[in-house]
Amino acid sequence: MSGNFEGIKRQKFGVEIECTGLTREDAAEAVANVLGGTPDYFGGSYDKYNVLDSKDRKWSIVYDSSIKCVDKNGNSASRNYAVELVTPVLEYEDMPLLQEVVRAVRKAGGVTGAEYCAGIHVHIDGAPYTAQSLRNLVNIFASKENFLFDMLQVSPMRESYCQKVDRNFLEKLNKQKPKTIEEIQKLWYDGDISQVHHHYSSTRYRACNLHSFFANRNWEMRACNSTLHAGVIRSYVILALAISNAALTKKFCSPHISESENLRYSARVWLINLGLNGEEYKNCRKHLISHLEGNIAWLHPEDAIKQRERLKAERIAAREQRVEPVREVQQQDDNVPAEIPEPTVSEYDEDFEQEETFEMSM
């Protein structure tokens, strides 16, 4: 399988993880235990705690007003239990560190999920983007959003915070084919570009959030239910990196909506086409598609049944062909004088043919 997939590991990213079950102070202590630093209480409107890592990068624990707060026993709790972990700008090699931080927060009592109005936001560096690659990015999301929302298990409780691509914006984007990022910005804000300065612009609540791109030069994938499973978070980040790499390297991505009667198979094919193939991404693929319905090996499951029946018929036919010569030899042996040595069965017997293994070609 060929493709330009090296960029998956070359892009920078950041993650915001919302949770509750512990206080911001406790979360900061848990993060500091991993990073080897000391929590520094900054305060401010987000009641922020900062922790520096060995590279002097700032990991922050901040307040988020949207979180439904509970304590470690699941009882309603104060706003001190509204926790959002904000990473610094990270590189692919930092993935194990991110996972250790996540595990530490969970071990300290962190809980999360749609029932707490919590989510995960993955930010990808926008520096390499041009107008064409930004258009590609939007088209990828538009064409694969049905896949993504099922793969990432977007809860209906959170859909107001991660809406699908605005179809009016999508239509204008592909009809006008803007040549500059500034032109795309005007389309995104429907002409009101002053919104770029409003942190809580209503345009930010999209699964593919370009408000973040125009304001901070990084685009945001919001279509993730929150989790404190380190492997799942790694899968979310890698998926966002792979989508971004496709947007940056492909000449054109179609906005045509992908549909499938076998979502498990189609999602796997799409992930492999994004470059998430091989042993390195095995767990990533597993986390993203294991809960989907369908047959992972066959686009049309009925073909698998036909294939098994065909192979069974071939094995039966092969056995009959091997048995028949032996019968003929035995009949001939009855008419042969005793002094002529009788052929051994091993001269006629053959090994049974092994069942053919089929692999899906991509």
Describe each PLM feature range:
Residues M1-A114, A127-M362:
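C-terminal accessory/tail domains of diverse enzymes
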Residues Y116-I124:
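Short, conserved phosphate-binding/catalytic loop or strand-edge motifs used
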